[in-house]
Amino acid sequence: MLIAITGTPGVGKTTVAKLLAKKLNYEYVSLKDFALEKGCGRRVNDEVEVEIDELAYFIERELKGKNAVLDGHLSHLMPVDLVVVLRAHPKLIGERLRERGYDREKIGENVEAELVDAVLIEAIEEHENVIEVDTTNKSPEDVVEEIVSLINSGIKKRVGIVDWSEVYDEIIPYLRLGGE
């Protein structure tokens, strides 16, 4: 089974994806590294720009039928069996991205994306099997246990469990000023 771990930057994708792969004894695949290795991604400043259709082709050709956890912001756009959309309180995302040195504009974009469910909506538009998991106030290990429990119970769709509309006032500073 191919499992995509996706979400807004700062939700904990890489940590959770690595732990989940280990727990399930699946291969861990960083989409950025995979794209660079296959020649369908290139470094631009601090980011990797990816040709999505080419990347999907290589995923289909080289990973379909294998057990792997795909880690990356674009993993929900790949041909996978299950998409896990990680969510986190927008204020927490703003704080994490500020600690990573993101500029104000990038922090604002990502906080807004989390606020309006951007990644979740894209995932639902692309796939039938989508599970949403709120990582706020949970350890990565607890998040992995929740994902494994959902998979083992046969749940293939669980969305709509997160609603950040009530915290809008808390995150206005991140939208306007990058958290300052």
From Swiss-Prot:
Broad-specificity nucleoside monophosphate (NMP) kinase that catalyzes the reversible transfer of the terminal phosphate group between nucleoside triphosphates and monophosphates. Also has ATPase activity. Involved in the late maturation steps of the 30S ribosomal particles, specifically 16S rRNA maturation. While NMP activity is not required for ribosome maturation, ATPase activity is. Associates transiently with small ribosomal subunit protein uS11. ATP hydrolysis breaks the interaction with uS11. Its EC number is 2.7.4.3. The keyword Flavoprotein does not apply. This is Putative adenylate kinase. GO terms for biological process: ribosomal small subunit biogenesis; rRNA processing. Residues 99-109 are annotated as: LID. SUPFAM superfamilies: P-loop containing nucleoside triphosphate hydrolases (SSF52540). It holds the Pfam family AAA_18. It catalyses: AMP + ATP = 2 ADP; ATP + H2O = ADP + phosphate + H(+). InterPro entries: Adenyl_kinase_AK6, P-loop_NTPase. Keywords: ATP-binding, Kinase, Nucleotide-binding, Ribosome biogenesis, rRNA processing, Transferase. GO terms for molecular function: adenylate kinase activity; ATP binding; ATP hydrolysis activity. Interacts with uS11. Not a structural component of 40S pre-ribosomes, but transiently interacts with them by binding to uS11. Residues 30-50 are annotated as: NMP. It is an enzyme of class 2 (transferase). Belongs to the adenylate kinase family. AK6 subfamily. Gene3D superfamilies: P-loop containing nucleotide triphosphate hydrolases.
